[in-house]
Amino acid sequence: MERANRMSAANMIRSLLPLVVVSLLAVGWIAFRQGDPDPVRPIDPTSTVQLAAARAGYAVQVPSELPDGYRPTSARTDAGDAVDGAPVTLQIGYVTPSTEYAGYVTSDDPGADPLTDVLDGAEQEGTVQVAGEEWTRSTTGRGETALSREEDGVTLLVTGSAPDAELETVAAAIAPVAAR
């Protein structure tokens, strides 16, 4: 009979209660420490840009000295596979101050996928002057603005869901990559 009293439901609850409290405290502490409100993870595109600049047969230009709030989140190039004289394409993606996307592409291959994916089927809407350069303004099939221009056989493209003013800020910041 004494054994039956020791195994009552009340005794079981009293035994488990400290475990439940400790578990809830541990879960709450972990959740609190991981509660980063900004999911954007900026990257440093320098190595990708330098690789493209070293392998390209043209003077690579990229957005530089962008104002606060423009954070690079992706960078890729096909320069790692390029042989002498082969075309080189460089792409850099940014999150803008309005938390929208702005993408930059430069390539000496007019048929490069990152260019054709945006420009094929885009409706040209005229030109716009940005930092003394004339850019063709288009609307893509997804309804996004695309600013493009060609310079010495190299296409420069700025596009994305960001407002036009932010895309123009990216375009205005484009400058040649400094040789290292």
Feature-to-residue mapping (PLM):
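A short, solvent-exposed beta-edge/loop patch
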Residues: 31, 124-180
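Residue-level signal for functionally critical sites in structured catalytic/ligand-binding pockets
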Residues: 11, 19, 32-33, 92-95, ...
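Generic detector of leucine side chains in alpha-helical contexts
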Residues: 16-19, 24-25, 51, 66, ...
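Functionally constrained cores in energy, signaling, and assembly domains
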Residues: 15-18, 29, 100-109, 117, ...
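Short, solvent-exposed recognition patches
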Residues: 43-139
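Charge-rich, low-complexity N-terminal segments
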Residues: 1-73
